[in-house]
A protein has these predicted regions:
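N-terminal Rossmann-like dinucleotide-binding module
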Residues: 1-48
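Residues that mark the start of a beta-strand
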Residues: 3-5, 144-147, 234
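Predominantly a Rossmann-like dinucleotide-binding segment in NAD(P)-dependent oxidoreductases
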Residues: 12, 117, 124-217, 342
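Beta-loop-alpha module in the N-terminal Rossmann-like domain of NAD(P)-dependent dehydrogenases
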Residues: 17, 49-110
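Glycine- and charged-residue-rich phosphate/anionic-cofactor binding loop of Rossmann-like
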Residues: 28-29, 310-326
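Short, Asp-centered acidic motifs that coordinate Mg2+ and/or phosphate
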Residues: 31, 67, 147
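Hydrophobic residues in well-ordered beta-strands that form the structural core
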Residues: 93, 118-120, 149, 261
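Contiguous beta-strand/loop segments that form the cofactor/metal-binding neighborhood of enzyme cores
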Residues: 179-268, 293, 299-318, 332-336, ...
Length: 383
């Protein structure tokens, strides 16, 4: 059987997928595309001559690919995913599935129509702590989850913000706090298998936020959302918060006890069974030496293996398939709507064709378009 031909769209984040996939039997990483000349030169210094470094999407997508990894701008994944699937190419999306409700529907309908594989390759659920929460919860020993929490705090210096968002219309300057939820709500969803059905959210926007000198247009410190899940439980989750200190934290409170990651060490777990004392331990699923050579402490290596297992057919369904991935995007978008008007929003069942019809044609976006304008405020009282 011929190797699966893989292309990567976006050199900066995309190179995190190169090493592991290039070494995996049955796969040929044959193309990497980036529009920026400096990034293409940096990529060429790392990859072999057998990898074609392209300057345009059209050049890369014409190379007979079996699958493409989208590592381009956060708010542009859906459009390119649809173009790829329409050409018979499977899609791995590195970040949120879609930035608007209309594109959420367009993406799902395209995937259903074409029958292509789709995976949201969020790396946080593969990390040691979240992986142990999923293992313990799905074993059933703690019973049903009643309440859960997730925090993703990632402050940046002004120099880092300028490096990550170098242009006036860069998506990072405008992103609402609820949108970047793969590292928070995404972990709770994969650990429990549950889906959000309702959301109410508030943003953190104090006087100190308003007065902060920053290149970021959205000066909010982040957002907090409450989600009613499909089993009736309530999850509290941040999106991306710029507060200190940097870190991730997750907790599941269940009928039979609580399991959470340690705040000082997200690879360590605290387990409290009902009626018993605290058990603190390092899970068995620690990163290997080889995994630690890759990004995010080893999580990038793990998500690469999951990508290969899914594309090769070893795994039939990824942790975040098209429906779960799009639901995660909708949760963030409806969270912004809640911030803007103070209401609680129902999140449609994306599998239900009648329920999801409400999404059709709603392309309002907080991210600037080609004209430099956005069609949905990125926060309350921002015009």
């Amino acid at each position: 059987m011929a190797n699966k031909r893989i292309g990567i769209f976006g050199g900066r984040r995309g190179m995190a997928f190169y090493s592991v996939i290039a070494k995996t039997e049955g796969f040929s990483l044959c193309a990497i595309c980036d529009e920026q000349p400096q990034m293409r030169e940096a990529v060429k210094k790392v990859v072999g001559e057998e990898v074609q470094v392209c300057s345009t999407w059209e050049e890369m997508i014409s190379l007979g690919l079996d699958a493409v990894i989208l590592a381009n701008f956060f708010h542009e994944h859906a459009a390119y995913a649809i173009r790829a699937m329409e050409m018979g190419i499977d899609v791995i999306s590195e970040t949120t599935a879609a930035p608007t409700l209309g594109e959420c529907l367009d993406l799902v309908e395209c995937c259903e129509r074409t029958g292509r594989k789709y995976m949201l390759a969020a790396n946080c659920p593969t990390m040691v702590g979240p992986g142990e929460l999923m293992r313990v919860y799905r074993s059933g020993e703690l019973g049903e989850v009643l309440y859960a929490e997730a925090e993703y705090l990632h402050p940046t210096t002004e120099a880092e913000s300028l490096s990550l968002a170098p242009t006036e219309t860069h998506w990072r300057r405008f992103i609402p706090g609820t949108y970047y939820n793969m590292h928070s709500l995404g972990v709770l969803m994969t650990a429990t298998g549950l889906l959000p059905k309702r959301v109410t959210a508030m943003e953190i926007y104090t006087d100190s936020c308003r007065n902060r000198a920053t290149v970021l247009n959205n000066k909010s410190a982040g957002s907090i959302a409450l989600y009613q899940m499909d089993n009736g439980s309530v999850f509290r989750s941040t999106g991306w918060c710029t507060m200190s200190p940097s870190g991730k934290w997750f907790r599941l409170t269940c009928e039979g006890g609580t399991i959470e990651t340690e705040r000082e060490n997200q690879d360590r777990v605290l387990l409290r069974r009902k009626g018993k004392g605290l058990m603190k331990y390092d899970p068995d699923n620690q990163y290997t030496k080889e995994e630690k050579k890759e990004g995010h402490g080893g999580a990038d290596a793990r998500i690469c293996r999951q990508i290969c297992d899914y594309l090769s057919g070893k795994v039939e369904e990824p942790l975040l398939d098209i429906y779960r991935g799009v639901t995660l995007s909708m949760a963030g978008i409806y969270g912004l709507h809640s911030i803007l008007d103070g209401k609680t929003y129902d999140i449609p069942d994306i599998r239900n064709k009648e329920e999801r019809e409400i999404l059709r044609g709603d392309y309002r976006s907080p991210f600037p378009g080609k004209d430099g304008k956005w069609t949905l405020p990125f926060g309350k009282d921002r015009t």
